[in-house]
Amino acid sequence: MVSVSDIDSVQKAWGDGIVAIASAHSNGEDYVSIARNHVETLYAYGLTNVLFKPTLAAIEQFRPNFESALSYFVASNNECPEDKGFAIKGWTNVRFENADLILGDSTALAMGNYFFTTPEGDEVKVEYTFGYIVDSSGNLLSLIHI
């Protein structure tokens, strides 16, 4: 059974990943490798279909594969020309507030707001819905992100 603690952990990992990508980009480090790891370890690409609809995507609204998801975060591979690199905007913190959860044996849903802290210390509020699946190693991976 997926627990609240499992959801808290995967959400913390997701937020920490966004901050790590932003920090590496700001410091001239290999942010693309960090972003690749972020998508590889937190999304279910390669395991099942992933329903990813990034908030700021308007032309290429849906990201059904790994490369299109990576493009949204770092805009490094020219997969989706509209992308500007959401994760390289300098975010210094990400926090989640779940409105509600649905927990199952090998799946879970979470809906709420997450708050991205800008370099100036302002918070940007965005709504989310994540769907998760447990893989064969017991990892909780996102298969829905809208």
PLM segments and residue spans:
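Residue-level recognition of alpha-helical structural elements
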Residues: S3, G28-Y31, D122
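A solvent-exposed, acidic/Ser-Thr-rich amphipathic alpha-helical stretch
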Residues: K12, G28-A99
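Short, flexible helix-adjacent loops and helix caps
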Residues: A22-S26, P119
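Exposed beta-sheet edge and beta->alpha loop/turn motif
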Residues: D100-S137
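Short beta-strand segments enriched for Tyr within beta-sheet-rich domains
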Residues: N139-L141
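Conserved small/polar residues in nucleotide/adenosyl-binding loops
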Residues: I144-I146
